[in-house]
Amino acid sequence: MGLRVYNTLSGNKEEFVPVEPGKVKMYVCGVTVYDHCHIGHARANVVFDVIYRYFCHLGLDVTYVRNYTDIDDKIINRANREGVTYDLISERFIKEFDRDMERLGLKLPTCQPKATEHIDEIISLVQTLIDKDFAYQAGGDVNFCVEKFDSYLKLSGRTLEDMQAGARIEVDERKRHPMDFALWKEAKPGEPFWESPWGKGRPGWHIECSAMSMKYLGTTFDIHGGGKDLIFPHHENEIAQSEAATGKPFVNYWLHNGFVNINSEKMSKSLGNFFTIKEVLDRYDNEVLRFFLLSAHYRSPIDFSDQNLTEAEAGLERIYKALAAVEETLAAGNGCTGAPVDASSLNEAEGELFDKTTSISARFGEAMDDDFNTALAMAHVFDLVRCVNRVLSETAGASDNICSLCTLIKAEVAKIAGVLGIFSSKPASFLERLKSRKAGNLDIAVDEIERLIAERTAARKAKDFKRSDEIRDQLAAKNIVLLDSQQGTTWSVK
């Protein structure tokens, strides 16, 4: 059936048909760089990173543009508070954003333009709107005339009358309509400015995204994304000014991710109930955060809490333990031929594992083709993991069939890992990393754990099972779980 995406513009799932066959052009609104990013920003960027990765996985040629808003009232206000220039603020937080995105494991977009590097394009677009009588000068400002654009508010499904009746808008007598918005702002004394036909000033918020997206992607492109909070006014205004200027449809598919909530309230700086990406990644592995953010459908709200992150951590640990068992089986089967699986030689359990492994890519693809349903995609991964655990636990030794199956499992999971940006660490490394993080929260030192395990090993050799059991119980009381195998005793944290 092909890929179907939910288009905010139509309110329906639609078949995805790119403007140019074999190519995808997508633009995602980046951050205003005046402060550290919170995990609401993490969600938007992880969501569109996975969408970007999935298009690449499908073999499409993707141009992905994500901007920086590096001039804005918030940036200027912070610069004034700190007594520095605006560009020092923006450059500082661009670096912080880039560091956060790197820690989250995001692929770099094709292009990351800055508003301040596209002033000429912005001025040209504003002038076009004036020439076409969609914009007017008001002192040193230039405003967009919303009443001139017949389909204004078509993205959010509102009306000007409803907006005006329910709005608390400061009256500006220079505006022809209270909902008119700024394309160009006259510079106040002491503010950064650029020369323009309307005097010294700077861009409004919305115009920069239209100018930059159309420069790199053309007048009509495939996908524009962002958080639901951007539907109005930002994306609504982008549509108005872009389509007024070109007379063509601006974007074919509008995608919006849901909010991250705390206690059923949207997480945001303005509400003061936010956690920065850095704060969360200092406490949890980056893959755990990605796993958590992808555990719900991207359009649904997701509730952030330590409990939910701990549950995500436990889920990811289960998957990695299964992958570790696959690695251990392959390591134990040094003499395996590595030949392709001979389905006719498999027993019933092996046959079930073969079927689930060979179908995982198709099931994963079906989930992703249904509006990038990562929650369902994850469910298919867990289904495979349960089968892996059952079959490997019931299998004695590493037969050629089992080794061939494990090789196949590794290859299939690697494909999924490339799309989701998780499961890509070496299993042993991830589990050790996770154990170290958990151990940091214990009230017993790692050295003491290792000492007690060594003492228990000696007690077992001496057949002092009473002491052996005492040590196991002592460690269990500290949330330490012991696992005995032919290779020795390993431990993990509950």
From Swiss-Prot:
Q: What is its EC number?
A: 6.1.1.16
Q: Which GO terms describe its cellular component?
A: cytosol
Q: Which GO terms describe its biological process?
A: cysteinyl-tRNA aminoacylation
Major location (coarse) = cytoplasm
* GO MF annotations in UniProt: ATP binding; cysteine-tRNA ligase activity; zinc ion binding
Amino acids binding Zn(2+): 29, 209, 234, 238
Record motif 'KMSKS' region, residues: 266-270
**Cellular compartment(s):** Cytoplasm
Location of motif 'HIGH' region in this chain is 31-41
Q: Which InterPro entries match?
A: Cys-tRNA-ligase, Cys-tRNA-synt_Ia_DALR, Cys-tRNA/MSH_ligase, CysS_C, Rossmann-like_a/b/a_fold, tRNA-synt_1_cat_dom, tRNAsynth_Ia_anticodon-bd
The record's keywords, sorted A to Z, are: Aminoacyl-tRNA synthetase, ATP-binding, Cytoplasm, Ligase, Metal-binding, Nucleotide-binding, Protein biosynthesis, Zinc
Q: Which reaction does it catalyse?
A: tRNA(Cys) + L-cysteine + ATP = L-cysteinyl-tRNA(Cys) + AMP + diphosphate
Q: Where does ATP bind?
A: 269
Free-text comment on the cofactor: Binds 1 zinc ion per subunit.
Cofactors required:
Zn(2+)
Entry's family note = Belongs to the class-I aminoacyl-tRNA synthetase family.
Its quaternary organisation is:
Monomer.
Name this protein carries in UniProt: Cysteine--tRNA ligase
Q: Which organism is it from?
A: Geotalea daltonii (strain DSM 22248 / JCM 15807 / FRC-32)
Q: What is the lineage of its organism?
A: Bacteria, Pseudomonadati, Thermodesulfobacteriota, Desulfuromonadia, Geobacterales
